[in-house]
């Protein structure tokens, strides 16, 4: 494939920059377990079969299921849709009044889950985590409406891509896959992420 009006052609890829979706799920679940100790947890997925959704779900399940005293009571898709996530969270707390945490596979669904719990007067005592580290999620963490999120750092992603291109242009060797660094944002460290994108 060649760029229109250019002699530059792409014959093969020299490397791939990505995010470890399973690691995001593991990090969220680990932080949740450290906070709740034991109890019932639930996972609200994105689109079933999508790489981000499956990776984050599998990572979280691995941590939850390997922790004694933690029970995964529900794993259900909400298709990245806020209304579906709202409904799923509302149903979860009605069916499991002793629920300790909900891990949502992105912040949009986590914000909706938080709203559902608040509307059902059930937020107190239930942790809500998402993924992406959006401004809305960070504000919700500051305000106590969410409890954590895992970064999906777009600015770091862009900088890493530029560094990769510079190295390639200088003939330097690249790893086949380069993973972006990730961080847990929670109520303890939220102030450190002001202005983080």
Q: PLM features: residue spans?
A:
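Rossmann-fold dehydrogenase core element
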Residues: 144-151
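Hydrophobic alpha-helical segments within soluble ligand-binding/sensing domains
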Residues: 17-41, 55, 84-86, 134-137, ...
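Single conserved hydrophobic/aromatic residue that forms the stacking wall/gate
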Residues: 1-5, 9-10
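Conserved acidic residues
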Residues: 14, 100, 147
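Short beta-strand segments enriched in small/hydrophobic residues
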Residues: 14-15, 40-48
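Hinge/cleft segment of the Venus flytrap/periplasmic-binding protein
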Residues: 44-48, 52, 63-67, 73, ...
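Hydrophobic alpha-helical
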Residues: 60, 73-74, 78-139
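Short, solvent-exposed amphipathic alpha-helices that sit
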Residues: 24-28, 51-70, 84, 88, ...
């Amino acid at each position: 494939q060649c760029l229109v009006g250019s002699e530059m052609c792409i014959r093969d890829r020299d490397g791939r920059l990505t995010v470890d979706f399973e690691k995001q799920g593991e990090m969220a679940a680990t932080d949740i377990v450290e906070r709740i100790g034991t109890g019932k947890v639930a996972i609200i997925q994105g689109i079933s079969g999508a790489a981000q959704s499956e990776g984050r779900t599998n990572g979280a399940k691995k941590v939850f299921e390997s922790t004694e005293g933690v029970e995964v009571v529900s794993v259900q898709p909400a298709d990245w849709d806020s209304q579906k996530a709202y409904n799923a969270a509302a149903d979860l707390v009605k069916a499991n009044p002793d629920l300790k945490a909900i891990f949502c596979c992105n912040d949009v669904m986590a914000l909706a889950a938080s709203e559902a719990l608040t509307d059902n007067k059930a937020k107190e005592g239930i942790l809500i985590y998402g993924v992406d580290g959006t401004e809305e999620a960070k504000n919700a963490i500051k305000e106590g409406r969410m409890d954590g999120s895992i970064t999906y750092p777009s600015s770091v992603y862009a900088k890493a891509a530029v560094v990769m291109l510079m190295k390639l242009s200088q003939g330097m060797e690249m790893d086949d896959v380069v993973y972006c660094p990730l961080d847990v944002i929670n109520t303890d460290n939220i102030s450190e992420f002001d202005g983080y994108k």
